[in-house]
Amino acid sequence: MGVPLRVVSYNIHSQRDDTAALAAVVRSAKPDVVIVQEGPRRFRWRQKSATLAESFGLVVAAGGLPALGNLLLTSLRVQVLDTRCQRFPLTPGRHLRGAAYADCRVAGARFTVAGSHLSTDPAERPAQAVEFKRGLDAATSPVLAGADLNEGPDGPAWATVSQGLTDAAVAADRADRLTYSCHEPRRRIDALFVDPRITVVDYDVVDTPQTRRASDHFPVLVDLLLPGTD
């Protein structure tokens, strides 16, 4: 038997929308891990990250400004063993991007959780995907990676990041579920990829009146079984 883990990957639109709805969406999901894109990354980012985590009933594991707004949050069930942040090379005139990583343990199972948010510029994304993939490949535990890739499964950056990993939506036969935008869903640009040793039990893109108020992206909610290692 594996160890259950519930994960949410969520672009929260820099908390520009209904923050009460946002908190309610995450709390109702009862996740062990939340991978946030567009989290706090500027003035007082530590305090803002802690406040966001508290509103979700979670704690900050890694990320924030050092990861350019990628933020990893966990429940107290998850033990965080180590963390690191990554910054991708800057293209002049564009936004600086990066990734966050946390090595964790839950009920005797080790895993590495990672999050990133790639550029809206298709010329930048392939190189950023290579950097993110290097970070994922450096992990010594089974990886789960949540990202807003800003492109669909037919894109080159998506292909780079997903290589050797399982697309949770495909594994659950729900790749038809679109993640963006909440106003007019047309694209699946948000994904959760997992090590093949991790079992995808269930996958959902949560589309409700509340999630439509909370952000411009729908949250990706995935139930996993981790391989026990201890």
Question: Can you annotate each of these PLM segments?
Answer:
Residues M1-E54, N70, L225-D230:
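N-terminal, active-site-proximal structural segment of metallo-dependent hydrolase catalytic domains
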Residues G2, V33, E38-R110, D204:
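Structured beta-strand-rich core segments of catalytic domains in phosphoester-bond hydrolases
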Residues I12, G39, S116-L118, A147-L149, ...:
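Active-site metal-binding loops of divalent metal-dependent hydrolases
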Residues D32-V33, F111, P142-L144, D167, ...:
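Short, Asp-centered acidic motifs that coordinate Mg2+ and/or phosphate
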Residues G57-R77, T91-H95, N150-F218:
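Active site of divalent-metal-dependent phosphoester/diester hydrolases
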Residues Q86-L90, A114-A123:
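Surface-exposed cleft-lining segments at the edges of enzyme active sites
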Residues P126-S141:
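A long, amphipathic alpha-helix that forms part
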Residues S141-P153:
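Acidic/histidine-rich, metal-coordinating catalytic segments
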